[in-house]
Structures are given as C-alpha cells and as structure tokens.
Amino acid sequence: MLERIVHAVSMGGNMVVNFGPQADGDFRTEEKEIAKAIGKWMQKNGECIYACDYAGWEKQAWGYYTHKKNSVYMIVFNRPYSKQLTVKVPKETQIINAILLNGEKMKVTETARNEYNVRVPKQDFQEPFVIKLEIKSSKTSTNKYYEALT
C-alpha cells in the first residue's frame, strides 16, 4: 500500500486510502495494521510526500523520486546489492548534497554526464528509506562534461 501511495505522488497525483467499517462499526484488524504502518512511516518520512510533486527524473529500479522546491527525494524500496544507487539527472542539474532524512550525510559520486551514484549506508533498513538530494539547476552549470559537437 505504501508503495502505491509513493508511486502516485511521484507521478504528480494523490491517493485516497479507504477502509470501510464492518457492521459493528469497527475496522478489520488487517486494515488497522496497514493504517498504523503507513502512519508510522509517514511520521518519519512525510517530508518526501506532503506538498511534493513529480520530479521529472528518469525512474530507476530502486524506487521513486518526488520533488519540492530545490530538493528531490529518493524513496528507496529496492536496495541494490552494490550499495550504489544510480541517479540520472536532467541536463544542467547537479546534485549538491545527499542526506538521509535522519540527518546522515551520504557520499555522492559523479560517474558520467548527468549521472551520479549515491552510496547506501550499511544500515539494515526494514522499510523503505528516503534520501534528500539538494540540487542546483541552471543554464550556467559548472558540469565538467560538454556536449559533443557533430
């Protein structure tokens, strides 16, 4: 359910989660557990959902992007064995900084034009985690790669 919510926000939409009460007015145990788990995750990571929108970045197999002001959020559902998350940024966009929402700074390496690797920490995450990217986007980017002239 959480992945569906994140997917909807990453595409510029929203999602309504509807739990219908039983005849006695109570909710099913499974529904209560789902709502509690979503609420717990949102308390820690809601910054990547609330007031966020479509980022316009190429989707990667590890998860989704959302966007708010000068930040892009990486919501990681599939942690790669390589411990490297590939991030392909739009033209003239640079990643300035990457931090987990708990404040831990991440190592970012530019690997090619418009492509970075973000090193995943050694922590054992039991649920999807979020990395906040501070970005700079301008026509006068200091990118060291140049367009090929043909």
Where are these regions (language model features)?
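Mature catalytic domains of secreted/periplasmic carbohydrate-active enzymes
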Residues: 1-150
